[in-house]
Amino acid sequence: MRVLHVAPEAYPLAKVGGLADVVGALPKALGPLGVEAHVLLPWHGGLEARRVGEVAFAFFGREERAPLGERVEGGVRFLLLGVEGFGRERVYGYPDDAERYLRFALAAKEVARGYDLVHAHDWTAALLALYAPTVYTIHNLAHQGLVDPGLFFSWTGLPWSLFHMEALEFYGRVNLMKGGIVFARRVTTVSPSYAEEIQTPEFGMGLDGVLRRHAGKLRGILNGLDTEVFDPGKDPYLPAPYTREDPSGKARAKEAFRERTGLRPPVLAYVGRLDYQKGLDLVLKALPRLLEMGFRLYVQGVGDGGLQEAFLRAEEENPEGVRFLPAYDEAMARLAYAGAEAVLVPSRFEPCGLVQMIASRYGTPPVARAVGGLKDTVEDGRAGVLFETYHPEGLLYGVLRLFRLGAEEMGLRAMEKDFSWEGPARAYREVYREALG
């Protein structure tokens, strides 16, 4: 079985968030199961690859051509499409993102002709479901890919007969994610709990009705973690290796983390995107009480400008209690996972989440909200703590409960958990078989 993963990002070539980790790791785990899986990405700026050909495709009624590159990393074959509009620094965040990714998808469908099945990821690849046998994965329902219908049908050449409620239409616009849900043979999302939640008005982002209508082909498969990449026993970013059996090296990591940040323990760490989805407003509101109780806060990430300003101000006002690193720095992230006393994952909603898995693997227990994949991965009261209420008091309660029950002991128990891709890969192989009938 030959499967082409089509996505906007994949580790280690291009990474913005957890989507990249999934697309980089799943194909590697599928190989031993008899699935030949390759990854197709846009040829983003700065990526080096060997040019292996050219792809001809139609866009806006005319033929275009895009160079096709190839690169092998970690045993995975990556293909890069150099369509117009890419070659820039960022993966997302440009005014013409819809046009760029539709052009990419139309070129990708030509590459897909050589495969049995397409595995399309999020809105940027959803269009493939209209052209090829597709398994479509929703990583985050909040980003749906809304496009003006006049532009969409001009760019793609698809018939206007698709612009109705049972197909692509969504409140007067084309919704690419809706198209993926409707036209894919199977739809997956990244945790069992999130698959249930998105069928409700609270979490469905306006697509709950569509998802309920297509519930028969919806599966929730928990993301795995690349346990070769995230392994404290051989992590090159740590000052000393450690394992659950011999955790002595963790003390070295804590010491190095303290030296780098200037924060005395106990330190609560947040590593990830600066986004209100991630519950950072709760962290800011709870911060005065946390500092009063003797906790320190380390925050690392980029994203929303308002949140960035708020954490910069918090650091200025509390130089001994808060440290903010507004950057993507993998070395510091690994040190935080290993050296903090706990990680905070207070999300409003969370399709799966990788931070809580990585931290657990590094023996640092999570304090997480009981939503989505966090419910499926954090063993409450044994290897971390879950809290229900989206309120600063809920977060404070979770932090206090963790330390009352024993944060260090919970961290050691968290290291026992199996977050490898082996189980999820088997589940995806079964979904592929269903999709191919």
UniProtKB/Swiss-Prot annotation:
Pathway: Glycan biosynthesis; glycogen biosynthesis. It is an enzyme of class 2 (transferase). SUPFAM superfamilies: UDP-Glycosyltransferase/glycogen phosphorylase. InterPro entries: Glyco_trans_1 (IPR001296), GS/SS (IPR011835), Starch_synth_cat_dom (IPR013534). It catalyses: [(1->4)-alpha-D-glucosyl](n) + ADP-alpha-D-glucose = [(1->4)-alpha-D-glucosyl](n+1) + ADP + H(+). One of its GO terms (biological process) is glycogen biosynthetic process. Signal peptide: none annotated. Keywords: Glycogen biosynthesis, Glycosyltransferase, Transferase. Its EC number is 2.4.1.21. It comes from the Bacteria. ADP-alpha-D-glucose binds at K15. One of its GO terms (molecular function) is alpha-1,4-glucan glucosyltransferase (ADP-glucose donor) activity. Belongs to the glycosyltransferase 1 family. Bacterial/plant glycogen synthase subfamily. Synthesizes alpha-1,4-glucan chains using ADP-glucose. This is Glycogen synthase. It comes from Thermus thermophilus (strain ATCC BAA-163 / DSM 7039 / HB27).
